[in-house]
């Protein structure tokens, strides 16, 4: 499996090469998209990208956990967690090793 990580710069470069915007415009576009997605998630909205997947925020309630080293019970505070659920197409694409681009 590849050890490379796709970064904002990689996305910006791809927009530059494939869409034809300037490097600056490409970077601004990527930032704008990520900002819109982040803002929606902060508001508690889901972000659904067709054929890719859905990002959503879930509220987890307080509960009692256990310290694995000591066995001592510790309270786990309520929190919001970000989840991603890939679409069926994305699951298939990953399972097929990206052969069906």
UniProtKB/Swiss-Prot annotation:
One GO location term (cellular component): cytosol
SMART domains, sorted: BHL (SM00411)
Gene3D superfamilies on file: IHF-like DNA-binding proteins
Single annotated GO MF: DNA binding
GO biological process, one term: regulation of translation
Keywords, in A-Z order: DNA recombination, DNA-binding, Transcription, Transcription regulation, Translation regulation
Quaternary organization: Heterodimer of an alpha and a beta chain.
Protein name: Integration host factor subunit alpha
């Amino acid at each position: 499996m590849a050890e490379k990580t796709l970064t904002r710069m990689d996305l910006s470069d791809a927009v530059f090469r494939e869409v034809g915007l300037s490097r600056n415009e490409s970077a601004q576009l990527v930032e704008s998209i990520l900002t819109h997605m982040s803002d929606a998630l902060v508001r508690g909205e889901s972000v659904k990208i067709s054929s890719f997947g859905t990002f959503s925020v879930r509220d987890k309630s307080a509960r009692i956990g256990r310290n694995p080293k000591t066995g001592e019970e510790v309270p786990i505070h309520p929190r919001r967690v970000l989840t991603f659920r890939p679409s069926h197409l994305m699951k298939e694409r990953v399972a097929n090793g990206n052969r069906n681009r």
